[in-house]
Protein backbone atom coordinates (compact mmCIF):
# COMPACT_ATOMS: atom_id res chain seq x y z
CA UNK A 1 0.00 0.00 0.00
CA UNK A 2 1.06 3.62 -0.55
CA UNK A 3 3.02 5.39 2.14
CA UNK A 4 2.03 8.82 0.80
CA UNK A 5 0.66 11.20 3.40
CA UNK A 6 -2.96 10.24 4.07
CA UNK A 7 -5.85 12.44 2.96
CA UNK A 8 -6.90 13.02 6.56
CA UNK A 9 -8.79 16.25 7.37
CA UNK A 10 -6.83 16.35 10.63
CA UNK A 11 -3.57 16.40 8.67
CA UNK A 12 -2.76 20.03 7.80
CA UNK A 13 -0.46 19.01 4.96
CA UNK A 14 -2.05 16.35 2.76
CA UNK A 15 0.13 14.80 0.09
CA UNK A 16 0.43 16.54 -3.22
CA UNK A 17 -1.95 14.97 -5.71
CA UNK A 18 -1.64 14.50 -9.48
CA UNK A 19 -4.69 13.63 -11.56
CA UNK A 20 -3.48 12.17 -14.86
CA UNK A 21 -6.01 11.77 -17.68
CA UNK A 22 -4.91 9.41 -20.47
CA UNK A 23 -7.48 10.07 -23.16
CA UNK A 24 -9.39 6.99 -24.33
CA UNK A 25 -7.35 4.46 -22.32
CA UNK A 26 -8.98 1.06 -22.84
CA UNK A 27 -8.85 -1.26 -19.79
CA UNK A 28 -7.78 -4.39 -21.70
CA UNK A 29 -4.95 -2.45 -23.33
CA UNK A 30 -3.62 -0.90 -20.13
CA UNK A 31 -3.69 -4.33 -18.49
CA UNK A 32 -1.64 -5.76 -21.35
CA UNK A 33 0.77 -2.81 -21.23
CA UNK A 34 1.32 -3.30 -17.50
CA UNK A 35 1.74 -7.07 -17.87
CA UNK A 36 4.25 -6.73 -20.71
CA UNK A 37 6.38 -4.17 -18.90
CA UNK A 38 5.41 -1.35 -21.28
CA UNK A 39 3.74 0.71 -18.55
CA UNK A 40 5.98 0.58 -15.45
CA UNK A 41 4.69 3.85 -13.99
CA UNK A 42 1.07 2.72 -14.19
CA UNK A 43 1.99 -0.66 -12.73
CA UNK A 44 3.75 1.00 -9.80
CA UNK A 45 0.61 3.00 -9.05
CA UNK A 46 -1.63 -0.07 -9.36
CA UNK A 47 0.70 -2.13 -7.15
CA UNK A 48 0.55 0.48 -4.39
CA UNK A 49 -3.14 1.20 -4.68
CA UNK A 50 -6.16 0.08 -6.67
CA UNK A 51 -6.90 -0.70 -10.31
CA UNK A 52 -10.48 -0.32 -11.54
CA UNK A 53 -11.09 -1.97 -14.94
CA UNK A 54 -14.42 -0.29 -15.58
CA UNK A 55 -15.15 3.38 -14.82
CA UNK A 56 -18.24 4.65 -16.66
CA UNK A 57 -17.98 7.72 -18.87
CA UNK A 58 -20.69 10.29 -19.44
CA UNK A 59 -22.99 9.92 -22.45
CA UNK A 60 -22.24 10.96 -25.14
CA UNK A 61 -18.88 9.42 -24.29
CA UNK A 62 -16.91 12.14 -26.09
CA UNK A 63 -14.06 14.17 -24.64
CA UNK A 64 -15.71 17.58 -24.03
CA UNK A 65 -18.58 16.06 -22.05
CA UNK A 66 -16.32 13.70 -20.12
CA UNK A 67 -13.66 16.36 -19.47
CA UNK A 68 -16.30 18.62 -17.94
CA UNK A 69 -17.57 15.76 -15.76
CA UNK A 70 -14.06 14.87 -14.58
CA UNK A 71 -13.32 18.51 -13.75
CA UNK A 72 -16.60 19.19 -11.94
CA UNK A 73 -17.79 15.85 -10.57
CA UNK A 74 -21.23 16.24 -12.17
CA UNK A 75 -22.88 15.17 -15.42
CA UNK A 76 -24.08 17.52 -18.14
CA UNK A 77 -27.53 18.12 -16.70
CA UNK A 78 -25.52 20.32 -14.32
CA UNK A 79 -22.34 21.31 -16.20
CA UNK A 80 -24.15 21.90 -19.56
CA UNK A 81 -21.46 20.78 -22.03
CA UNK A 82 -23.58 18.47 -24.22
CA UNK A 83 -21.32 17.04 -26.93
CA UNK A 84 -18.44 17.55 -29.35
CA UNK A 85 -20.75 19.29 -31.81
CA UNK A 86 -24.01 20.92 -30.75
CA UNK A 87 -26.51 23.62 -31.65
CA UNK A 88 -26.81 26.74 -29.52
CA UNK A 89 -30.47 27.67 -29.32
CA UNK A 90 -29.50 30.97 -27.67
CA UNK A 91 -27.15 32.00 -30.51
CA UNK A 92 -28.91 30.01 -33.26
CA UNK A 93 -25.67 28.48 -34.51
CA UNK A 94 -23.60 25.31 -34.30
CA UNK A 95 -20.81 24.95 -31.75
CA UNK A 96 -17.91 22.76 -32.90
CA UNK A 97 -15.04 21.75 -30.59
CA UNK A 98 -12.75 20.21 -33.21
CA UNK A 99 -14.17 16.88 -34.40
CA UNK A 100 -11.65 17.04 -37.25
CA UNK A 101 -9.74 19.70 -39.16
CA UNK A 102 -12.14 19.36 -42.09
CA UNK A 103 -15.15 19.83 -39.80
CA UNK A 104 -13.52 22.86 -38.17
CA UNK A 105 -12.92 24.41 -41.58
CA UNK A 106 -16.60 24.10 -42.46
CA UNK A 107 -17.63 25.89 -39.28
CA UNK A 108 -14.78 28.40 -39.49
CA UNK A 109 -11.40 27.82 -37.89
CA UNK A 110 -11.42 31.04 -35.90
CA UNK A 111 -14.88 30.34 -34.50
CA UNK A 112 -13.93 26.75 -33.62
CA UNK A 113 -10.76 27.86 -31.82
CA UNK A 114 -12.58 30.56 -29.86
CA UNK A 115 -15.33 28.12 -28.86
CA UNK A 116 -12.85 25.43 -27.80
CA UNK A 117 -10.16 27.49 -26.08
CA UNK A 118 -12.25 30.28 -24.56
CA UNK A 119 -16.03 29.89 -24.76
CA UNK A 120 -16.13 26.30 -23.53
CA UNK A 121 -14.80 27.45 -20.15
CA UNK A 122 -16.01 31.05 -20.02
CA UNK A 123 -19.61 30.70 -21.24
CA UNK A 124 -20.58 27.13 -22.24
CA UNK A 125 -19.57 25.46 -18.96
CA UNK A 126 -22.22 26.43 -16.42
CA UNK A 127 -21.05 29.29 -14.17
CA UNK A 128 -23.04 27.71 -11.35
CA UNK A 129 -20.87 24.59 -11.04
CA UNK A 130 -17.30 24.97 -9.74
CA UNK A 131 -14.44 23.08 -11.29
CA UNK A 132 -11.97 21.26 -9.08
CA UNK A 133 -9.53 24.10 -9.81
CA UNK A 134 -12.01 26.73 -8.62
CA UNK A 135 -12.88 24.80 -5.47
CA UNK A 136 -9.23 24.34 -4.52
CA UNK A 137 -8.29 27.90 -5.53
CA UNK A 138 -11.01 29.17 -3.19
CA UNK A 139 -9.22 27.61 -0.22
CA UNK A 140 -6.25 29.95 -0.91
CA UNK A 141 -4.08 27.15 0.49
CA UNK A 142 -3.85 24.68 -2.41
CA UNK A 143 -1.56 25.57 -5.30
CA UNK A 144 -3.25 24.39 -8.50
CA UNK A 145 -1.68 23.58 -11.86
CA UNK A 146 -2.78 22.13 -15.18
CA UNK A 147 -1.44 21.12 -18.58
CA UNK A 148 -3.44 21.23 -21.82
CA UNK A 149 -6.95 20.06 -20.88
CA UNK A 150 -10.26 21.18 -22.33
CA UNK A 151 -11.66 22.26 -18.95
CA UNK A 152 -9.21 24.47 -17.09
CA UNK A 153 -11.37 27.15 -15.43
CA UNK A 154 -9.92 28.44 -12.17
CA UNK A 155 -9.60 31.70 -10.27
CA UNK A 156 -6.29 32.99 -11.68
CA UNK A 157 -6.15 35.26 -14.73
CA UNK A 158 -3.77 34.36 -17.56
CA UNK A 159 -2.77 36.36 -20.62
CA UNK A 160 -1.88 34.66 -23.90
CA UNK A 161 1.80 33.82 -24.04
CA UNK A 162 4.04 35.81 -26.37
CA UNK A 163 6.98 33.38 -26.26
CA UNK A 164 6.54 32.09 -29.83
CA UNK A 165 5.64 33.71 -33.14
CA UNK A 166 2.39 31.72 -33.33
CA UNK A 167 1.32 32.69 -29.82
CA UNK A 168 2.15 36.33 -30.51
CA UNK A 169 -0.13 36.09 -33.53
CA UNK A 170 -2.78 34.38 -31.38
CA UNK A 171 -2.62 37.20 -28.84
CA UNK A 172 -3.43 39.68 -31.61
CA UNK A 173 -6.18 37.45 -33.03
CA UNK A 174 -7.99 36.57 -29.80
CA UNK A 175 -7.19 39.61 -27.62
CA UNK A 176 -8.52 38.05 -24.45
CA UNK A 177 -7.36 36.47 -21.21
CA UNK A 178 -8.64 33.37 -19.43
CA UNK A 179 -9.23 32.23 -15.87
CA UNK A 180 -7.42 29.03 -14.94
CA UNK A 181 -5.43 27.30 -12.20
CA UNK A 182 -2.51 29.12 -10.61
CA UNK A 183 -0.09 27.47 -13.06
CA UNK A 184 -1.61 27.04 -16.52
CA UNK A 185 0.16 25.57 -19.55
CA UNK A 186 -2.24 25.15 -22.48
CA UNK A 187 -0.78 24.25 -25.89
CA UNK A 188 1.76 27.12 -25.77
CA UNK A 189 -1.17 29.57 -25.82
CA UNK A 190 -1.06 29.99 -22.05
CA UNK A 191 2.17 29.50 -20.11
CA UNK A 192 2.40 30.78 -16.56
CA UNK A 193 6.18 30.67 -16.65
CA UNK A 194 8.93 30.48 -19.22
CA UNK A 195 10.16 26.92 -19.64
CA UNK A 196 11.93 24.94 -22.36
CA UNK A 197 8.66 23.09 -23.08
CA UNK A 198 6.98 23.41 -26.49
CA UNK A 199 3.96 21.61 -27.93
CA UNK A 200 3.91 23.08 -31.45
CA UNK A 201 0.58 24.66 -30.53
CA UNK A 202 -0.85 21.38 -29.25
CA UNK A 203 -0.29 19.21 -32.31
CA UNK A 204 -1.26 15.52 -31.85
CA UNK A 205 1.86 13.52 -31.11
CA UNK A 206 3.46 16.48 -29.33
CA UNK A 207 1.01 16.98 -26.50
CA UNK A 208 2.14 14.16 -24.20
CA UNK A 209 5.79 15.19 -24.33
CA UNK A 210 4.75 18.80 -23.61
CA UNK A 211 2.76 17.64 -20.58
CA UNK A 212 5.69 15.52 -19.38
CA UNK A 213 8.07 18.46 -19.79
CA UNK A 214 5.77 20.86 -17.94
CA UNK A 215 4.95 18.30 -15.24
CA UNK A 216 8.63 17.64 -14.60
CA UNK A 217 9.31 21.37 -14.37
CA UNK A 218 6.48 21.85 -11.86
CA UNK A 219 7.75 18.94 -9.74
CA UNK A 220 11.38 20.07 -9.81
CA UNK A 221 10.44 23.61 -8.79
CA UNK A 222 7.78 22.68 -6.21
CA UNK A 223 5.05 24.73 -7.87
CA UNK A 224 1.87 22.78 -7.12
CA UNK A 225 -0.15 20.89 -4.56
CA UNK A 226 -2.71 19.66 -7.11
CA UNK A 227 -1.88 19.15 -10.78
CA UNK A 228 -4.04 17.91 -13.64
CA UNK A 229 -1.63 16.21 -16.04
CA UNK A 230 -3.33 15.64 -19.39
CA UNK A 231 -1.89 12.97 -21.74
CA UNK A 232 -4.20 13.07 -24.79
CA UNK A 233 -2.13 11.49 -27.57
CA UNK A 234 -3.44 7.97 -26.91
CA UNK A 235 -6.82 9.09 -28.26
CA UNK A 236 -5.46 10.28 -31.62
CA UNK A 237 -3.32 7.13 -31.96
CA UNK A 238 -6.33 4.92 -31.26
CA UNK A 239 -8.57 6.85 -33.67
CA UNK A 240 -6.04 6.28 -36.44
CA UNK A 241 -4.79 2.76 -35.70
CA UNK A 242 -7.62 1.21 -33.71
CA UNK A 243 -7.98 0.48 -30.00
CA UNK A 244 -5.90 -2.69 -30.15
CA UNK A 245 -2.88 -0.58 -31.12
CA UNK A 246 -3.05 1.30 -27.84
CA UNK A 247 -0.16 -0.50 -26.15
CA UNK A 248 2.26 1.71 -28.07
CA UNK A 249 0.48 4.96 -27.18
CA UNK A 250 -0.12 3.91 -23.57
CA UNK A 251 3.60 3.15 -23.31
CA UNK A 252 4.35 6.65 -24.64
CA UNK A 253 2.01 8.20 -22.07
CA UNK A 254 3.54 6.05 -19.34
CA UNK A 255 7.01 7.30 -20.33
CA UNK A 256 5.91 10.89 -19.67
CA UNK A 257 4.41 9.90 -16.34
CA UNK A 258 7.67 8.12 -15.50
CA UNK A 259 9.52 11.31 -16.48
CA UNK A 260 7.46 13.28 -13.96
CA UNK A 261 8.18 10.70 -11.26
CA UNK A 262 11.91 10.79 -12.02
CA UNK A 263 11.84 14.55 -11.52
CA UNK A 264 10.65 13.83 -7.99
CA UNK A 265 13.42 11.38 -7.10
CA UNK A 266 12.25 8.19 -8.82
CA UNK A 267 9.16 6.04 -8.54
CA UNK A 268 9.37 4.97 -4.91
CA UNK A 269 10.40 8.35 -3.52
CA UNK A 270 7.81 10.10 -5.66
CA UNK A 271 4.93 7.83 -4.65
CA UNK A 272 5.94 8.14 -1.01
CA UNK A 273 5.20 11.86 -1.27
CA UNK A 274 2.42 12.07 -3.87
CA UNK A 275 -1.10 10.73 -4.18
CA UNK A 276 -1.89 9.66 -7.75
CA UNK A 277 -5.06 9.20 -9.77
CA UNK A 278 -4.74 8.02 -13.38
CA UNK A 279 -7.87 7.62 -15.46
CA UNK A 280 -9.42 7.45 -18.89
CA UNK A 281 -12.21 9.83 -19.83
CA UNK A 282 -13.82 7.11 -21.98
CA UNK A 283 -12.75 4.00 -23.88
CA UNK A 284 -12.45 3.16 -27.60
CA UNK A 285 -13.98 0.58 -29.93
CA UNK A 286 -13.20 -0.58 -33.46
CA UNK A 287 -14.98 1.07 -36.41
CA UNK A 288 -15.99 -0.77 -39.57
CA UNK A 289 -18.90 1.17 -41.08
CA UNK A 290 -20.30 4.69 -41.44
CA UNK A 291 -23.83 5.82 -40.55
CA UNK A 292 -25.55 8.00 -43.16
CA UNK A 293 -27.23 10.52 -40.86
CA UNK A 294 -27.48 13.39 -43.34
CA UNK A 295 -28.77 11.08 -46.06
CA UNK A 296 -31.52 9.84 -43.77
CA UNK A 297 -32.82 13.40 -43.42
CA UNK A 298 -32.11 14.53 -46.99
CA UNK A 299 -35.76 15.52 -47.50
CA UNK A 300 -35.70 17.83 -44.47
CA UNK A 301 -34.29 21.36 -44.44
CA UNK A 302 -31.13 20.78 -42.38
CA UNK A 303 -29.14 23.75 -41.11
CA UNK A 304 -25.70 23.70 -42.79
CA UNK A 305 -22.46 24.54 -40.94
CA UNK A 306 -22.43 27.99 -42.56
CA UNK A 307 -25.78 28.82 -40.98
CA UNK A 308 -27.21 29.79 -44.38
CA UNK A 309 -31.00 29.65 -44.50
CA UNK A 310 -31.29 29.44 -40.73
CA UNK A 311 -34.77 31.02 -40.68
CA UNK A 312 -36.16 28.21 -42.80
CA UNK A 313 -34.21 25.26 -41.35
CA UNK A 314 -36.20 22.44 -39.83
CA UNK A 315 -33.40 20.45 -38.16
CA UNK A 316 -29.88 20.86 -36.83
CA UNK A 317 -27.88 17.62 -37.04
CA UNK A 318 -24.98 17.20 -34.63
CA UNK A 319 -22.87 14.06 -35.21
CA UNK A 320 -20.25 13.29 -32.57
CA UNK A 321 -18.38 10.11 -33.47
CA UNK A 322 -20.56 7.23 -32.17
CA UNK A 323 -23.34 9.50 -30.96
CA UNK A 324 -25.48 12.18 -32.53
CA UNK A 325 -28.07 14.77 -31.53
CA UNK A 326 -30.98 16.17 -33.53
CA UNK A 327 -32.47 19.58 -32.71
CA UNK A 328 -35.99 20.43 -33.88
CA UNK A 329 -36.06 24.00 -35.17
CA UNK A 330 -39.75 24.00 -36.07
CA UNK A 331 -42.56 25.61 -34.10
CA UNK A 332 -44.66 22.46 -34.58
CA UNK A 333 -42.18 20.44 -32.55
CA UNK A 334 -44.53 17.75 -31.28
CA UNK A 335 -45.67 16.58 -34.70
CA UNK A 336 -42.12 16.77 -36.04
CA UNK A 337 -40.75 14.78 -33.10
CA UNK A 338 -42.71 11.65 -34.01
CA UNK A 339 -41.48 11.76 -37.60
CA UNK A 340 -37.85 12.39 -36.60
CA UNK A 341 -37.85 9.55 -34.08
CA UNK A 342 -39.34 7.11 -36.60
CA UNK A 343 -36.79 8.13 -39.22
CA UNK A 344 -33.88 7.87 -36.76
CA UNK A 345 -34.90 4.40 -35.59
CA UNK A 346 -34.83 3.17 -39.19
CA UNK A 347 -31.23 4.27 -39.88
CA UNK A 348 -28.78 1.41 -40.34
CA UNK A 349 -26.23 1.38 -37.53
CA UNK A 350 -28.33 3.27 -34.99
CA UNK A 351 -28.64 1.20 -31.83
CA UNK A 352 -30.73 3.41 -29.54
CA UNK A 353 -32.87 6.53 -29.98
CA UNK A 354 -33.78 8.71 -26.98
CA UNK A 355 -36.46 11.41 -26.70
CA UNK A 356 -38.85 13.04 -24.24
CA UNK A 357 -42.38 11.69 -23.73
CA UNK A 358 -44.10 14.12 -21.34
CA UNK A 359 -42.06 13.95 -18.10
CA UNK A 360 -40.36 10.67 -18.96
CA UNK A 361 -37.47 9.76 -21.23
CA UNK A 362 -38.20 7.12 -23.85
CA UNK A 363 -35.54 4.85 -25.36
CA UNK A 364 -36.23 2.82 -28.48
CA UNK A 365 -34.27 0.30 -30.50
CA UNK A 366 -34.55 -2.98 -32.36
CA UNK A 367 -35.04 -4.92 -29.10
CA UNK A 368 -37.99 -2.84 -27.95
CA UNK A 369 -38.86 0.36 -26.15
CA UNK A 370 -38.95 1.57 -22.55
CA UNK A 371 -39.60 4.80 -20.68
CA UNK A 372 -38.19 5.90 -17.35
CA UNK A 373 -37.95 8.71 -14.83
CA UNK A 374 -36.71 9.06 -11.25
CA UNK A 375 -39.01 7.07 -8.99
CA UNK A 376 -39.08 4.40 -6.31
CA UNK A 377 -39.75 1.17 -8.19
CA UNK A 378 -36.24 -0.16 -8.72
CA UNK A 379 -32.66 0.78 -7.80
CA UNK A 380 -29.74 0.74 -10.21
CA UNK A 381 -26.27 -0.56 -9.37
CA UNK A 382 -25.18 2.85 -8.02
CA UNK A 383 -28.21 3.13 -5.74
CA UNK A 384 -30.33 5.60 -7.68
CA UNK A 385 -34.01 4.74 -7.85
CA UNK A 386 -36.19 4.79 -10.95
CA UNK A 387 -39.63 4.20 -12.37
CA UNK A 388 -39.24 2.03 -15.48
CA UNK A 389 -41.96 0.92 -17.91
CA UNK A 390 -41.62 -1.18 -21.04
CA UNK A 391 -39.17 -3.76 -22.28
CA UNK A 392 -35.97 -4.04 -20.25
CA UNK A 393 -34.40 -5.90 -23.16
CA UNK A 394 -34.16 -2.52 -24.91
CA UNK A 395 -31.03 -2.01 -22.77
CA UNK A 396 -30.31 -5.74 -22.35
CA UNK A 397 -31.16 -5.14 -18.69
CA UNK A 398 -32.65 -7.35 -15.99
CA UNK A 399 -33.81 -6.97 -12.40
CA UNK A 400 -32.34 -9.17 -9.69
CA UNK A 401 -33.14 -8.77 -5.98
CA UNK A 402 -34.71 -5.39 -6.66
CA UNK A 403 -31.65 -4.04 -8.48
CA UNK A 404 -31.64 -3.13 -12.17
CA UNK A 405 -28.52 -4.50 -13.86
CA UNK A 406 -27.55 -2.89 -17.17
CA UNK A 407 -24.11 -4.32 -17.89
CA UNK A 408 -24.06 -3.60 -21.63
CA UNK A 409 -24.99 0.05 -21.05
CA UNK A 410 -23.25 0.81 -17.73
CA UNK A 411 -25.03 3.33 -15.51
CA UNK A 412 -27.31 3.69 -18.50
CA UNK A 413 -30.37 5.33 -16.97
CA UNK A 414 -28.40 7.99 -15.10
CA UNK A 415 -26.27 8.83 -18.13
CA UNK A 416 -29.25 9.09 -20.49
CA UNK A 417 -31.26 11.09 -17.96
CA UNK A 418 -28.39 13.57 -17.56
CA UNK A 419 -27.98 13.89 -21.33
CA UNK A 420 -31.68 14.46 -21.93
CA UNK A 421 -31.94 16.96 -19.06
CA UNK A 422 -28.98 19.00 -20.26
CA UNK A 423 -30.49 22.34 -21.39
CA UNK A 424 -28.14 22.50 -24.39
CA UNK A 425 -28.73 18.93 -25.61
CA UNK A 426 -30.71 18.04 -28.70
CA UNK A 427 -34.34 16.94 -28.74
CA UNK A 428 -33.45 13.46 -30.00
CA UNK A 429 -30.25 11.60 -29.08
CA UNK A 430 -28.75 8.67 -30.98
CA UNK A 431 -26.29 5.98 -29.92
CA UNK A 432 -24.57 3.84 -32.54
CA UNK A 433 -24.30 0.07 -32.69
CA UNK A 434 -20.83 -1.37 -32.06
CA UNK A 435 -18.56 -0.94 -35.12
CA UNK A 436 -20.59 1.99 -36.54
CA UNK A 437 -19.77 5.72 -36.50
CA UNK A 438 -21.47 8.95 -37.58
CA UNK A 439 -19.16 10.95 -39.93
CA UNK A 440 -18.64 14.51 -38.74
CA UNK A 441 -19.58 17.62 -40.73
CA UNK A 442 -16.25 17.36 -42.54
CA UNK A 443 -17.25 13.82 -43.65
CA UNK A 444 -14.50 12.36 -41.46
CA UNK A 445 -14.96 8.95 -39.85
CA UNK A 446 -12.52 6.44 -38.38
CA UNK A 447 -13.25 3.32 -40.44
CA UNK A 448 -10.55 0.70 -39.76
CA UNK A 449 -9.55 2.77 -36.74
CA UNK A 450 -11.18 3.43 -33.39
CA UNK A 451 -13.80 5.75 -31.96
CA UNK A 452 -16.18 6.32 -29.04
CA UNK A 453 -19.27 8.28 -28.08
CA UNK A 454 -22.02 5.70 -27.61
CA UNK A 455 -23.86 4.49 -24.53
CA UNK A 456 -22.53 0.96 -25.07
CA UNK A 457 -19.90 -0.50 -22.73
CA UNK A 458 -17.32 -0.79 -25.53
CA UNK A 459 -16.97 3.01 -25.52
CA UNK A 460 -18.03 3.75 -21.99
CA UNK A 461 -15.81 1.78 -19.60
CA UNK A 462 -12.35 3.27 -19.18
CA UNK A 463 -9.53 2.39 -16.81
CA UNK A 464 -8.91 4.00 -13.40
CA UNK A 465 -5.88 3.59 -11.11
CA UNK A 466 -5.07 5.39 -7.87
CA UNK A 467 -2.86 5.28 -4.81
CA UNK A 468 -2.34 7.50 -1.77
CA UNK A 469 -6.00 8.52 -1.72
CA UNK A 470 -8.87 6.33 -0.49
CA UNK A 471 -11.83 5.19 -2.54
CA UNK A 472 -15.16 6.75 -1.54
CA UNK A 473 -17.00 4.42 0.86
CA UNK A 474 -19.91 4.01 -1.56
CA UNK A 475 -17.57 2.73 -4.27
CA UNK A 476 -16.11 -0.20 -2.37
CA UNK A 477 -18.48 -2.44 -4.37
CA UNK A 478 -17.36 -1.03 -7.72
CA UNK A 479 -19.74 0.63 -10.19
CA UNK A 480 -17.45 3.61 -10.67
CA UNK A 481 -18.22 6.74 -12.67
CA UNK A 482 -15.83 9.42 -13.88
CA UNK A 483 -17.98 11.78 -11.76
CA UNK A 484 -16.52 10.13 -8.63
CA UNK A 485 -13.02 11.53 -9.12
CA UNK A 486 -13.43 15.27 -8.45
CA UNK A 487 -15.04 14.61 -5.04
CA UNK A 488 -12.09 12.33 -4.15
CA UNK A 489 -9.69 15.19 -4.90
CA UNK A 490 -11.70 17.79 -3.00
CA UNK A 491 -12.01 15.46 0.01
CA UNK A 492 -8.27 14.76 -0.09
CA UNK A 493 -7.55 18.46 0.42
CA UNK A 494 -10.33 18.94 2.97
CA UNK A 495 -12.07 21.42 0.68
CA UNK A 496 -15.49 19.76 0.67
PLM feature segments, named:
Residues 1-51:
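Active-site-proximal N-terminal segment of extracellular/periplasmic enzymes that hydrolyze or transfer
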Residues 31-85, 145:
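Short, structured active-site-proximal loop/turn typified by the sulfatase FGly-forming signature C/S-X-P-X-R
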Residues 33-37, 160-165, 242-247, 289-299, ...:
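Short secondary-structure boundary/capping segments
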Residues 37, 53, 60-62, 84-121, ...:
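Secreted, luminal/periplasmic, and some membrane-associated catalytic domains
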Residues 74-240, 372-406, 425, 439, ...:
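His/Asp/Glu-rich, glycine-adjacent segments
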Residues 205-229, 234-276, 416, 484-486:
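A long, amphipathic alpha-helix that forms part
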Residues 301-331, 449-492:
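Substrate-binding rim/cap in mid-to-C-terminal beta-strand-loop elements of soluble/periplasmic
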Residues 391, 399-403, 424-426, 431-469:
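C-terminal, low-complexity/hydrophilic appendages and adjacent surface loops
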Amino acid sequence: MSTAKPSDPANPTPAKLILTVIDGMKPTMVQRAMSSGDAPALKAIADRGQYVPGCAAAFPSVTPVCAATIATGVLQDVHEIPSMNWYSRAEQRYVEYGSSFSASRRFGLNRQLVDTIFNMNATHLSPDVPTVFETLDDTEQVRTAGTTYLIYRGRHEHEISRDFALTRAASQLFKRSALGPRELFYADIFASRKTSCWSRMGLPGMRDQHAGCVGSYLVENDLFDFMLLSLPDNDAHSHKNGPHAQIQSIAAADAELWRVMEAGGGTDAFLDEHAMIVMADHSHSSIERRIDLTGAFADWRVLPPSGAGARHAELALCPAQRSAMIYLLLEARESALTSVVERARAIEGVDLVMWWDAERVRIGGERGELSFAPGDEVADARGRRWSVDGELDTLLAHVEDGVLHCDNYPDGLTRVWAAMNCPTSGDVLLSAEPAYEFPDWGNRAHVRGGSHGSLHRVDSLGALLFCGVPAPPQRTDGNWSIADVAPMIIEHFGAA
